[in-house]
Regions:
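Noncatalytic carbohydrate-binding groove/subsite architecture in carbohydrate-active enzymes
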Residues: 140, 171-303, 309, 313
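Boundary/entry segment of secreted carbohydrate-active catalytic domains
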Residues: 25-72, 82
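Substrate-binding cleft of extracellular glycoside hydrolase catalytic domains
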Residues: 34, 89, 94-205, 303
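Aromatic-rich peripheral "rim/lid" segments of glycoside hydrolase catalytic domains that contact
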Residues: 28-39, 45, 314-335, 339-430
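C-terminal motif of bacterial Sec signal peptides marking the signal peptidase cleavage site
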Residues: 15-18
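Acidic-and-aromatic substrate-binding clefts and catalytic sites of carbohydrate-active enzymes
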Residues: 61-64, 85-99, 125-128, 140-143, ...
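Conserved, mostly hydrophobic/aromatic
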Residues: 84, 164, 238, 303-305, ...
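Catalytic domains of carbohydrate-active enzymes, especially glycoside hydrolases
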Residues: 68-93
Length: 430
């Protein structure tokens, strides 16, 4: 009898310890999720990054609904994306705040759902987007409210918002409608950093600005000003943009087919052009790195934007640089992911879905066609393999199942692919 009591006691003790350990494991798992920070996420290939706009109509007046955003988030999550970049928190454009709501709802529905956000705060100069001449030496009075809203959302969603990006291409001088001087970006970055120190923002929230490589010192000397040096010191990391696609028109020296390659098969000419495109992006990345190190600074540098359009009736189309099609997009996407994942660089690939508001009066304008998915939810060539793997099974966009463009017919796709111009042809145009 006593022996039986002892056995029961021992078994009960084992059960209690087991339950206790299980509870500890569950608590530990929960704590790990809560404690994920920007430092953990950035540069981690387990957290693929992407630029995201969920707009489906020709005007941003038509805001995507929460259910539509949740559709998109499920699609992106299925392909391994866990870090989104948004661009503004303007009062009339609740897209970003709705994305945060949608993520929170999905997390409540599924404890394993994981998605984080680099929240953009839009920065303008005085008179931007008006009929008055932009004053690039004075900032817009709207900037203060934009920063306040971004900070408020970071506090409301500390489990989701891990980064605030002050401005989008807000310092680069070709943004003639709205660019500001580096001192404006520095002012707001310092303000947010001060809020962190005062305990008014999460201490692990990272602050940056997302801008062209040249704005981060990788280009001409006109950008090498004291306020940029201070900005490099002030941010937690650098978020730089690089676009070989656009430079196939504006700086095409790398793009043309060399004389020595003229007798190669067209497929080889295209593949080698895309290898040069990757090297172009890497060179711009290295130029920002070199500038940063010349200041005695050593911080992470990640790619806040890069992408490749699939339709263009302008500079990049059949009568231009002939850079535009899904095949080239596929080669670029794969090579960028491969390089950045191996190098420990986050790449906010631009972008998730086509958005037709970007060039609303020109349906075939390249800005409308940077997505990895069409508006209808068709997967473009770069991610056909994911469709084959079945990761989108059961998911829809606008009632459409996720299928391949061109009905998955690569031969049909290749009919739309053009070889880049020769070096001689490019030089003759310049």
């Amino acid at each position: 009898m006593k022996k039986g009591v002892v056995i029961i006691f021992v078994l009960s003790l084992v059960f209690m310890v087991s339950c206790s350990e299980k509870k500890k494991d569950e608590m530990s798992s929960t704590q790990i999720k809560k404690e994920v920070t920007a430092k953990d996420i950035l540069g981690n290939p387990q957290y693929l990054a992407i630029s995201y706009g969920g707009y489906r109509e020709r005007s941003r007046d038509s805001q995507p609904t929460i259910p539509e955003l949740k559709e998109d988030l499920k699609i992106l999550s299925a392909m391994g994306v866990k870090l989104l970049r948004t661009y503004n928190v303007q009062p009339k454009l609740p897209h970003a705040s709705n994305v945060l709501k949608a993520i929170r709802e999905l997390k409540a529905e599924d404890a394993d759902f994981e998605m984080y956000v680099m929240l953009g705060a839009w920065i303008d100069c005085l008179n931007a987007w008006t009929d008055k001449a932009p004053n690039h030496d004075v900032e817009s009075p709207n900037n203060e409210g934009e920063i306040e809203r971004a900070a408020a959302l970071a506090n409301e969603y500390p489990d989701i918002v891990k980064i605030i990006a002050v401005g989008n291409e807000a310092m680069v001088k070709w943004a003639t409608s709205y660019y500001v001087q580096p001192e404006v970006i520095l002012k707001w970055v310092n303000h947010l950093q001060d809020l962190k120190k005062e305990g008014k923002l999460p201490k692990d929230l990272w602050i940056t600005s997302s801008d062209d490589f040249s704005s981060w010192g990788g280009g001409s000397a006109e950008y090498h000003v004291e306020d940029l040096e201070k900005l490099v010191e002030a941010v937690d990391f650098i978020s730089m943009h690089t676009y070989p696609y656009h430079n196939s028109h504006y700086n095409p020296e790398f793009w043309g087919v060399p004389e020595a390659h003229k007798d190669m098969p067209d497929s080889t000419k295209i593949e080698m052009a895309m290898e040069r495109a990757l090297k172009f992006a890497q060179k711009q990345y290295d130029s920002v790195t070199n500038y940063m190190k010349s200041l005695g600074v050593n911080k992470p540098i990640h790619i806040g934007e890069t992408g490749w359009a699939t339709i263009s009736n302008g500079h990049y189309g059949n009568n231009g640089s002939r850079a535009t099609d899904e095949y080239k997009q596929g080669l670029y996407y794969k090579s960028m992911r491969r390089w950045t994942n191996m190098a420990g660089i986050s790449c906010f690939y631009f972008e998730a879905f086509n958005e037709k508001w970007k060039d609303a009066h020109n349906a075939k304008g390249s800005e409308n066609h940077f997505g990895l998915f069409t508006i209808e939810g068709k997967a473009k060539y770069p991610i056909w393999d994911l469709v084959d793997q079945g990761i989108f099974d059961g998911l829809t966009r606008g009632g459409n199942t996720i299928t391949k463009t061109y009905n998955g017919d690569k031969a049909l796709l290749l009919e739309d692919v053009l070889v880049p111009p020769s070096e001689e042809e490019i030089m003759a145009r310049r």
